[in-house]
Amino acid sequence: MNAAIPNQAAKFLAATAHVDEAAVQPLPNSRKIYVEGSTPDIRVPMREIRQADTPLMFSGEAGTGAERSEPNPPIFVYDCSGPYTDPAAKIDIREGLPALRTKWIEARGDTEVLRDLSSEYGRQQAANPELATMRFPGLHRHPRRAKAGMNVTQMHYARQGIITPEMEFIAIRENNNRAAYLESLRASGPQGAKLAALMSRQHPGQNFGANLQGEITPEFVRDEVARGRAIIPNNINHPESEPMIIGRNFLVKINANIGNSALGSSIQEEVEKMTWAIRWGGDTVMDLSTGKNIHETREWIIRNSPVPIGTVPIYQALEKVDGKAEELTWEMFRDTLVEQAEQGVDYFTIHAGVLLRYVPMTANRMTGIVSRGGSIMAKWCLAHHKESFLYTHFEEICEIMKAYDVAFSLGDGLRPGSIYDANDEAQLSELRTLGELTQVAWKHDVQVMIEGPGHVPMQLIKENMDIQLESCSEAPFYTLGPLTTDIAPGYDHITSGIGAAMIGWYGTAMLCYVTPKEHLGLPDKDDVKEGIITYKLAAHAADLAKGHPGAQIRDNALSKARFEFRWDDQFNLGLDPDKAKSFHDETLPKESAKVAHFCSMCGPHFCSMKITQDVREFAAKEGLNEADALARGMEVKAVEFVKQGAEVYRKV
């Protein structure tokens, strides 16, 4: 097998590669902060959003003087953007990000640095002079692998009772600095205790058996990983990544898919999609490239990514045999796994549950097999009339995974591609097989999550979640949507966002975004952002519905800002400050409108919140509570009505 010689090298030159300037700007009125752990090298990033003070007229405090106001301390939100939004960081994508986990990995003493790449294909690519102009220039280290007989997975450490720095990092990150925020409220003034109670109020949730914690501790993280209910996707060859966790007892996460195709995109564009995706909240990114220079594209993405990177290795393996599925071999696939593991891929989607006997079950479907990986393996099974090498060599795959700490994302190759096919025999048979394979992986202390559908109408979503929890022993579920209807091409980020919010509530740990281009074309940067924002909404709505501790703080802060006409704070506390501000400024562009007590929806005389504030002012002036003030106000208006002739309509 010869390494591919690119025919598009001139389109991307490593020497002129540059960061997307839009991705490195701090979000409005926000700054990057770092919360330190038990050692100085555990520095957990968060985004601090500063707010304006509440004017006296809204604060509820007695007293006079324009200087009196109620402070609104900054709130803290989960931040996936890595150093890109930190003005103090020096970003050069030709050098990649700092390897922040290297010392932790070295300190464990169970890995070794290899003299050369283990993959035949990787060595061919490294030696190919035609690739010199596009090759990532900043990697000055050799890959690592577990020492002989060692297991380097976070699950293995967890089962040995070891709390790793990654686990402590995650515990701090999941708590979102909530304790510090509430303390800042209590210390903010005479109304501090009342304000803390107001901002921390949250509706009780329905968590469907999830084990949510008031405070996440490193020990809780360790226990969940040991049980297999959560995974930490952190390949030892991706030390640039910031530790994160995927599990239903933690915040719901989202994934963004990027990747080139045979019809378009370049390395520069894919790196820009990655940095754009994490800016808006992508917790992980999957590189699904199927076009030219897959190896080189992936290297650039991994070296510049602070979030875990996932792939579907069978895509690249298929490119190596010119798209002929029947020519795939275990040896070629194994080499691809090692190649990608030594680059630093954090999780592999592997469609090992597509069994030969399940393929005929799809014959009467409306849309057949829609998974690319699933269709590749189904074709291979039929061509050779035997079970796929992914299934028969699964234990050997586990040996590779635990040597680099790559997590499984067991692929749903028979997922439904239409609501007509939802929850059918093929889909659920494969799901149960994935549960069996999970037990095999856990025997090797290899981390596992399970991929899910797909297209499922709302009334069938909970059944899907319940079957997964039972069949897969609560291994994290990772779903594409699901799309709840098939009638809206161009709007499938919405059709799927509905299903994503529901299945996230029922227990899915990570939601794979869908962009408006789904089923229609390759998404660009704008589509990536649209998909991310939609899925951040779905994940947050799921956290609220589950009753995840502290989930409502941001909602409360934005609602308070809205009621107090703090327009800039409304924009900045939202998921997309830029769009919120642009919509407002379309009709009220002047700076004075940022302090106006109305917007263009109702105008100055019909703003419900302004009317409510008028009632409160009237109540305070008359010494009444709000209910009595409304009654007194109605009496006054009634007298006016009679004096004016008791006519429903008056000439003016």
Curated annotation (Swiss-Prot):
Please write the reaction equations for the catalytic activity of this protein: 5-amino-1-(5-phospho-beta-D-ribosyl)imidazole + S-adenosyl-L-methionine = 4-amino-2-methyl-5-(phosphooxymethyl)pyrimidine + CO + 5'-deoxyadenosine + formate + L-methionine + 3 H(+)
Where along the chain is [4Fe-4S] cluster bound?
A: C599, C602, C607
Q: Which InterPro entries match?
A: ThiC (IPR037509), ThiC-associated_dom (IPR025747), ThiC/Bza_core_dom (IPR038521), ThiC/BzaA/B (IPR002817)
Pathway(s): Cofactor biosynthesis; thiamine diphosphate biosynthesis
One protein family per Pfam: ThiC_Rad_SAM
Q: Give any single GO term for biological process.
A: thiamine biosynthetic process
Task: Please provide the record's keywords in A-Z order.
Answer: 4Fe-4S, Iron, Iron-sulfur, Lyase, Metal-binding, S-adenosyl-L-methionine, Thiamine biosynthesis, Zinc
Leader sequence segment: none
Q: Entry cofactor note text?
A: Binds 1 [4Fe-4S] cluster per subunit. The cluster is coordinated with 3 cysteines and an exchangeable S-adenosyl-L-methionine.
Q: Where does substrate bind?
A: N257, M286, Y315, H351, S371, R372, G373, D412, G413, L414, R415, E451, Y478
Q: Name one GO molecular function term.
A: 4 iron, 4 sulfur cluster binding
* Cofactor list: [4Fe-4S] cluster
Q: Name one GO cellular component term.
A: cytosol
Please describe what this protein does.
Catalyzes the synthesis of the hydroxymethylpyrimidine phosphate (HMP-P) moiety of thiamine from aminoimidazole ribotide (AIR) in a radical S-adenosyl-L-methionine (SAM)-dependent reaction.
Per UniProt, subunit arrangement is:
Homodimer.
The family database entries (NCBIfam families) matched by this protein are listed as: PRK09284.1 (NF006763), PRK13352.1 (NF009895), thiC (TIGR00190)
Return the similarity comment: Belongs to the ThiC family.
This chain's protein is named Phosphomethylpyrimidine synthase
The organism is: Thiobacillus denitrificans (strain ATCC 25259 / T1)
Q: What is the lineage of its organism?
A: Bacteria, Pseudomonadati, Pseudomonadota, Betaproteobacteria, Nitrosomonadales
